[in-house]
UniProtKB/Swiss-Prot annotation:
Keywords: Coiled coil, DNA recombination
Name of the gene encoding the protein in the UniProt record: rmuC
Gene Ontology process terms (BP): DNA recombination
PANTHER family, per the entry: DNA RECOMBINATION PROTEIN RMUC (PTHR30563:SF0)
Protein name: DNA recombination protein RmuC homolog
InterPro entries: DNA_recombination_RmuC (IPR003798)
Species this chain originates from: Rickettsia conorii (strain ATCC VR-613 / Malish 7)
């Protein structure tokens, strides 16, 4: 009996799965049937409306027929009255009345034919629209069913990818790269992704990210993930084993010694290396701590700091502040030198402007002297010559030249006490 128990349990589980699948399939088909029933009801209502319109058109046709019959009867009665009244009339008048009657009958026949053709055309148009809408609904239902099947396959594929070790690792690396790009740090200057290096024993290491901090500090980030972190089932033992293996392998890599050796060969001086184990979600950090409460103590003992996205963002914000402050302090001397050059340029410009002002002053003074001499000496002689009878022709002589004077004044300089002058003096 003991060996039949697993078989029975397996059979029951299979039956339960089949029942659940049958139930879900039944609910899906029931939903589709309800949707088709509603569509069929709507189509039936449209068909009833079309039938009512058809009945209305038929009634109008019958009314027109009755009207035509009534008019025909009236025409016949009028013909009889004419025959009785104008029996003694001339044959020409009788022929004329008969022709008019025929024309009226033909007109009424044409009106009846046009009305019938219009009604048949409207009915055919409505029937065509109904058939096209019904075919469109059937096509939409088929396409919707196909899309549902494709979406189900896509969801299963994504789920299988996330539950695989490679998929979980790629998820952690993508999350890390997105956080670094949104942190404000400069790629290939403040941080490097997927930095490859060779160890002392010719081994290959490839940390996910290196962040260069001021004062010879370096932050190494290595993302770790496991399918048990994204799996909803409780696999604490497997998760504990996997994450402790990651911690051991990360500690055995000796990032600090290998990275310092590798970077010092490239004329880059780093003194302190801090290693971060990045987990893709905060829930992953909580699951690791729940699986092994001593995991953080073990990691800290190896100088490794497990962090999630929130913890990493906090550390990156502090790192960005340090990098920005260090960059500002490095650029301080350059800024002072540029300010000195600017002040020197201002002095040179002031010298040139002083020379230009002096030249303008000399030009205006000399012009004023010339205008005074011209008006006083030259123009007086010209007037004397004109008095003697010599005309200047069509060109009118000016009375006097306008004189100009330039006024120079010294600008007042308003002195303002500088804030914290001792500190500025110390920096300069």
């Amino acid at each position: 009996m003991s060996y039949l128990l697993p078989t029975i349990i397996t059979t029951l589980l299979i039956l339960l799965a089949l029942i659940i699948w049958f139930y879900v399939k039944t609910q899906t088909l029931r939903t589709q049937l309800q949707f088709l029933s509603e569509q069929n009801l709507e189509i039936s209502n449209n068909n009833q409306l079309l039938n009512q319109e058809q009945i209305g058109y038929l009634q109008k046709i019958e009314q027109l027929q009755c009207k035509i019959e009534y008019q025909a009867q009236t025409i016949k009665d009028s013909e009889k009255i004419r025959e009785e009244s104008f029996s003694s009339a001339k044959a020409a008048l009788f022929d004329l009345g008969q022709d008019l009657s025929k024309q009226l009958i033909e007109i009424h026949k044409m009106e009846n034919t046009a009305a019938r053709e219009l009604a048949e055309k409207n009915i055919a148009t409505a029937s065509g629209k109904f058939n096209s809408e019904f075919e469109r609904l059937i096509t939409m239902v088929g396409a919707l069913n196909k899309d549902i099947e494709q979406s189900k396959g896509t969801v299963d594929l994504i789920k299988q990818s996330l539950l695989s070790p490679i998929g979980a690792g790629l998820l952690a690396e993508i999350t890390l790269e997105n956080i670094l790009k949104s942190s404000g740090l400069r790629p290939n200057l403040d941080f490097i992704m997927q930095y490859g290096l060779t160890t002392l024993d010719s081994g290959k290491l490839r940390p996910d990210a290196l962040i260069f901090l001021p004062s010879g500090n370096l932050m190494v980030i290595d993302s770790k993930a496991s399918k048990f972190l994204v799996d909803k089932q409780d696999n604490n033992m497997s998760l504990n084993k996997t994450m402790n293996y990651h911690l051991k392998s990360l500690a055995n890599k000796e990032y600090a010694a290998n990275i310092l050796t590798n970077l010092n060969k490239k004329d880059q001086s780093f003194n302190n290396v801090m290693t971060l184990m990045f987990l893709p979600t905060e829930q992953a950090v909580e699951k690791v701590i729940a699986a092994d409460p001593e995991f953080l103590q073990k990691a800290w003992g190896c100088n490794i700091f497990p962090v999630g996205p929130s913890g990493l963002m906090n550390m990156l914000s502090f790192a960005k502040f340090q990098i920005t402050d260090h960059r500002r302090s490095e650029n301080y001397k350059v800024i002072i030198e540029e300010v000195r050059k600017l002040l020197s340029s201002i002095g040179t410009m002031a010298d040139y402007s002083q020379k230009i002002g002096n030249n303008l002053h000399n030009m205006v003074t000399n012009y004023d002297k010339f205008a005074a001499s011209f008006n006083r000496n030259f123009m007086s002689r010209v007037k004397n010559i004109q008095k003697l009878g010599i005309d200047s022709g069509n060109k009118a002589m000016p009375a006097t030249l306008e004189r100009y004077q330039i006024v120079s004044s010294k600008s007042e300089i308003i002195e303002v006490e500088a804030e914290n002058p001792p500190q500025i003096a110390e920096k300069l």
